[in-house]
Amino acid sequence: MREGGAGEGQGAAVDEATGFEVGIVVPKLYRGAAAGCGEVENCVARLVRELEDVGLIVERVRGVPAEFIKLSAPMGTLGRVAAEMNMKKLTYIGMELQFEWDQVGAFVRQPDGSLFSWRERFACFRHLIYSIVNKTDSDITLSFDDKEFHWTQNESLLTRLEDEGIVKLVFPLHDEIKRKQLLRSWALKWFDFTWQPIDEIYSYFGTKIAIYFSFLGMYTRWLFFPAVFGLATQLIDFGSLQWLVLPAFFFFVISWAVFFLQFWKRKNSAVLARWGINYSFSEYKTMGNELDPLSFSMADDNVQQRKFGAPKEKSIVQRNEWFGVLLRIRNNAIIVLAIICLQLPFELAYAHLYAITKTEALRYVLTAVYLAAIQYYTRIGGKVSVTLIKYENNQGEQSSADSLVYKVFGLYFMQSYIGLFYHASLHRNIMALRQVLIKRLIVSQVLENLIENSIPYLNYSYKKYRAVHKKKHEKESPAGKSVRLSTRVEKEYLKPSYTASIGEELEDGLFDDFLELTLQFGMIMMFACAFPSIFCFAALNNVTEIRADALKLLVMLKRPAPRDAATIGAWLNIFQFLVVMAICTNCLLLVCLYDEEGKWKIEPGLAAILIMEHALFLIKFGFSHFVPEEPAWVKANRGRYVAQAQNVCSKQLLRSIAKLDAKLE
């Protein structure tokens, strides 16, 4: 991008322009067919002309698989569109106000100096291209190849072309300069371990992806502490104090997890403040959707005379609230029954087969087959979850996405841990449990990384082969001439999208990445006492995961469409739930380790374990209140912004009152 800093003034800002950040894909016509359109105007040529008329910079690229229309926009064009969309942006007094291009200097710039974030720019692009409508008094006849159709009055041109199958795809384009910079400073810097340029990631990919990598980096750094402690418990002989090692490690791990999650909340709020994102306002906008049914019911001539506190409006809101709660209870009950009746027997059968299998090689094969087979079951469960969510009264897309997260995690929770519970509680064989943990962690991580990195590459290679093969057999192609993809945009078009394996209409690819992370966290936390050095495997895997995910996003996939998410959402609640589960399961493991006779009596040792369990629950809920969720400087800035806003509003109100008094006199 070619965006300048905040001090260059509005005149310079008008001349700034983004890079080519959006692409439109249309079928490629033979040159003769494209030239001989007859009297009827070609629809692609009309689309290009309309895009230029609304102020966009257009470049047409004729590639091997299709023709591409690349779009860029001057800052002045984006500014006028943002004002037309009533876009809210943070000002220097801390208030989010409706954007006005004439007052551009009042609005906070992004960390990279640009006026608009990637999410805001992409929203402006989509609004521009989809708001091109037929403003004439009659229908317009357009053609493509031998096909003719009518563009009716007040109809979106791009939507009509999509319905006709002419526009195949509208997708974000990589900025080649920034992409290469991130490759050098982030994806290929393996020796930086957990350090990442989070501000640059935010500027390029948007809030949601940047928050994920910020969380992954902090989680990996904090993993080194239990990894060192866990390794020490395996390598060092503590002599007569050996019996205290595992309880001490258990106490340390739970305290570590509680502090980590609490300090993540602090970092999350600090990062949002640095990016100029008002999270409380985002929550307000999401909660505002809850009043949509009410607003429709009040849409009449006397709406301004109504009061929100009227009994009718209260009853409408309460009815919608409880109806949504009952729908969620019903759908969650369906998922729980499906897990108990269908998945639980399958998981127990696998655990039993694993226990009776004697050969290690066969156990690895059995685990691999099980992990592959369970994918189909979870995909079916995910589709059922998406269908159920459509009938829930969720307040907005984020609420629906959170509901999907909870339901799908329930399926994976049973899948991932029931076999481990089987070995821990029924057989009480800690050595067998350690072997299962190692196999699960190694096999699952190898399979996940193999799928994540190989399938996108194979998908791209297959699409590339098909496009080149098709081009060689076209009439225009000269015989014997080699055909290859020569432009960046056509290579990006053939790459897979960053989508979720389950419920892609609600979530992007971060769903799978967060799911993998939570399952790993649950495994290392709930069975920490059985295998303390498992934290070393997790830390090593996550260091690799940071760079592998970065390469995946920058090299192997299309640029993801930005999503507005200021936190990790429902995943944080799942992490906290897993900490509570870890307290229970590790107490059970300590009972199995110290109750060698299997009498399960409340002797002093077992009583001490129960006391420890209650103490850890107290720590879990107590430490959360001792560590503030926001740093002091964030609270101080908010207070200063509130004071500034009150001062400005009071002065403006006094001026308005003075002008009114002058008119009355």
From Swiss-Prot:
Family: Belongs to the anoctamin (TC 1.A.17) family.
Predominant cellular place of this UniProt entry's protein: membrane
InterPro entries xrefs: Anoctamin (IPR007632), Anoctamin_TM (IPR049452)
Membrane topology: Multi-pass membrane protein
Electron transport found in the keyword field: no
Membrane-spanning segments: 209-229, 243-263, 333-353, 361-383, 404-424, 521-541, 574-594, 607-627
Record keywords: Calcium, Chloride, Chloride channel, Ion channel, Ion transport, Membrane, Transmembrane, Transmembrane helix, Transport
Keyword Calcium appears in the UniProt entry: yes
GO biological process: chloride transmembrane transport
Entry function: May act as a calcium-activated chloride channel.
Localization in the cell: Membrane
Single GO molecular function: chloride channel activity
Protein name: Anoctamin-like protein Os01g0706700
Record's GO cellular component terms: chloride channel complex
Short name of one Pfam family: Anoctamin
Organism: Oryza sativa subsp. japonica
